[in-house]
Every structure is written in structure tokens, then in C-alpha cells.
């Protein structure tokens, strides 16, 4: 294979190169290498990573996500919305509500269609996992990490840990513009307490239904948005008594807004945009 067709899409500026594996079938042994290549802003297309839209024996489509460092992720909220848009618009599905398989399990997506195009997608992200063993954290166990003080070098932060199929640690901050992403993000991501690494979020509370959010993503660094991170931030806000279950929480990310609702049935709903940037052929 010397080339393949791709579609670049983004959810609130969190951009990936999407490859339709129903048609292209990139070789398994080269996926990490290709993800690194296409993600480069200098010698590739430029993105936060690569997402494959694959056949599935459990759902109409399966999503596989590769970060820009070549590592494979388990889940991606912004990616799910874009996969849903792609699947509907390219007639991989016919219904407006359908399942998508991920490495974290099955999720349900519902697309809002206008003139044949999808602009807004709601995804049922499932139930958050809160125990240290589920995150995972090194000390394991069934305890939760809620409003817990942790030391990272000489810096102490108070955080809440949430898994949305991938691990997150959420820290409150008084001024989101002062979030120490570049200095503490890579340190916390690779802290030995988190054996699989972790996504790092700083959150400023405006009120019980409005949060400002910045993220350092595991394997990608600073990004414009993180859908699972926004879900984790809303869940953490509820766990810390700031927000309530079963209410819409608007999360302001660098790339735009997501609406998150942690329902009484335990499921977290995420609603936001998905956009196509361009299509083309990539030469290997």
C-alpha cells in the first residue's frame, strides 16, 4: 500500500485523521507508525492523532484511536461524535441512533440531521468508573479518589479521579488562564501512581451549570478539547457537591462548548458538534 484516502475532522478543534477501514484496510503492524506520520504538522497532515472507522461484529462500526505519539487509546469523546457523523453521512448506518464499538465497550450515538448533514451528536458515554482499581491507580482497591490532596514534586494539588473508559484526574483552579498545563501536565501524566498514564484536567467553576476547562491529554499533550475529559470534569463537579445529577452542565473548552449531563440512571450524556475539514489522499 503506497497511499490511502483520509478525512480530517474535528470536534471543537480536537482534530484527527479518519480512515475508513471498510475500504482502506491499513496494515496492523504499521498503524502506530502511520499515526505518528500523519499527525505531524511539518511532514504530515497535522492532527492530534488518527482514528480508524472499522467493521465490527458487535455494532455497525468500531472506532480505534491512535494518539500522535503512536500509542493506542481506549476512548475519545470528540472522536466518537466525528465517527458518528462520518458513519451516517457515508451511509455506513441508516438510523440516526446506533451503537459504536470502542476498546472500552459499546456506546450509543444519536445524530441530529439537517439537509442530510450531521452537525450535532449526542453520545451516551456510559457510567463513570470511580474506584482506584478501575482507573487504574497503583494502589488499586475499591476506594474512590475524591477531593484528595496529592504531591507532585514540590507542588500539592487536590484532585478527583474519574474513568470514562480512559483515566482522568481533575483539579479545581481559581483562574483557568493560570492552569499549569505545560509544566505539570507531562509530570502528572507519567506519575507512577497512574501505571497506564492519565489525562490531566484543570477546571474553573463559574456556577453549578458552567465550567471552564483545559486539558493535557495522555499521549497527545495540550489539545483544544477532550470529550471524555469534559465528562470527567462534570462528574467530578457533582462528586464534590458543586453540580447536580440530571442537569445540563456547559463545559467551556479552548475549542468551544460541550453540554454534559450525568443522568440519574448513572449514564453520562455528551452533546456537541462534529465537523469535516477536508478529504484527500495520503502518500506513504
Curated annotation (Swiss-Prot):
It catalyses: (2S,6S)-2,6-diaminopimelate = meso-2,6-diaminopimelate. Its main location: cytoplasm. GO terms for cellular component: cytosol. The active site is at 76 (proton donor), 226 (proton acceptor). Pathway: Amino-acid biosynthesis; L-lysine biosynthesis via DAP pathway; DL-2,6-diaminopimelate from LL-2,6-diaminopimelate: step 1/1. The record marks 168, 217 as: Could be important to modulate the pK values of the two catalytic cysteine residues. GO terms for molecular function: diaminopimelate epimerase activity. Substrate binds at residues 14, 67, 77-78, 166, 199, 217-218, 227-228. Its EC number is 5.1.1.7. Keywords: Amino-acid biosynthesis, Cytoplasm, Isomerase, Lysine biosynthesis. GO terms for biological process: lysine biosynthetic process via diaminopimelate. It is found in: Cytoplasm. InterPro entries: DAP_epimerase_AS, DAP_epimerase_DapF. It holds the Pfam family DAP_epimerase. Homodimer. Catalyzes the stereoinversion of LL-2,6-diaminopimelate (L,L-DAP) to meso-diaminopimelate (meso-DAP), a precursor of L-lysine and an essential component of the bacterial peptidoglycan. Belongs to the diaminopimelate epimerase family. This is Diaminopimelate epimerase. The gene is dapF.
